[in-house]
Amino acid sequence: MEIHLKLTHLAIAAAAAMILPVAARAQDHLRTQIDTTVRLDRGGTVDLSLISGKIRVTGWDRPDVKIAASIDNGELRFDANPSRVSLSVEDSDESGRRRHRDVGDARYEVSVPRGSKLILEAVSGDITASGSQGEIEANSVSGDVEVTNGVREVSAEAVSGSVRASQINGNLRAETVSGDVRAESVTGDVEASSVSGNVKIVGVLSKEVRTETVSGDITYAGSIDAGGRYSYESHSGTIRLNIPRGTGAQFSVETFSGDVSADFPIQIRAGGSKREGHMEFTLGDGRARVTLETFSGRVVIDTGADSTTRRDDE
C-alpha cells in the first residue's frame, strides 16, 4: 500500500513589484499588520502562506479581497494585482538567511469573491476555508485543515493534523500522515488516505473512490454508482460499508486474519471465487466494482442505508 502525499513548498517567493499606479501603495510592502481591501478579477487567485498561526478564508458576493492580518514578531509581505493577491511571512533577514525561529504567530482573516481560486499553506497552523465556491489547495505541515464549498478540484492535505472536507462539487483529494480524514457531501471522485488515522466518507455521490489507511478504520456511507470503481484498503483496521438497498456491484474482498460479515447472504455465483483469505461475489446486477482489502481487520457490509445522504457520526 502506498500513500502519496504531495507536500508543496511552503515558503512563497515574493512576486515582482507591480507597475499599476492605482495599486502601487499595495504592492510589495513589508508590514506587521495589514487591513486593506483590493479588487480581484473574476476567477482570480488568492495565495496565502504563513509559518505559524491561523488562516481563515470565507467567500462573499463582492468583487474584492478584504484582508485583516497581523504577526506577533516578523513582517508580512503583501502583493496584489487584478488577477492575483498574495500574502506571506517574510522569513529572511537582510543577508537572505531563513529565520523561522524568530518569526511569531500570524493571523489571517480574509474574505474573497466567490469563484476565486485559493492556495493556502502553513508550516505550523490551522487552515479553514468556507464559501469560496472555487478551486482550493490547502496544505499544512502541523495543523488541521478544513475546507467547504469547493468546486472542480479540491486538495486538502496535512502531515500532522486532521483533514475535513464537505460540500465539494468536484473532485477531492484529502490526505494526512498522522490524523483523521473526513469527507462529506462530495459529487466528484474521492481520494482519501491516512497513515495513522481513520478515514470517513459520508453522503457522497461519486463514481470513483479510493481510500487507504495503515492503522485506522475506514467507513463509507454513500452511493455505489453503476459502472463506478471503489477501493478500500486498511492494514489493521475495520472497513465498514453502508450502501443503499438495491446496489449492484461485483465485490472482491481480501483479509488475512479478519472476518467478513454482511446483512445479506453472500453467495458465490458462477464466475465468482472463494479461497482462504479471499472471496469474490456479486450483488444485484454487478455493474460496479468494489475492492476491499485488510490484513488484520474486519470487513462489514451493510445495505440498510436508506439514502445517499445518511450520516455516520458514530
Per-region residue spans from a language model:
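Intrinsically disordered, low-complexity terminal regions
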Residues: 1-314
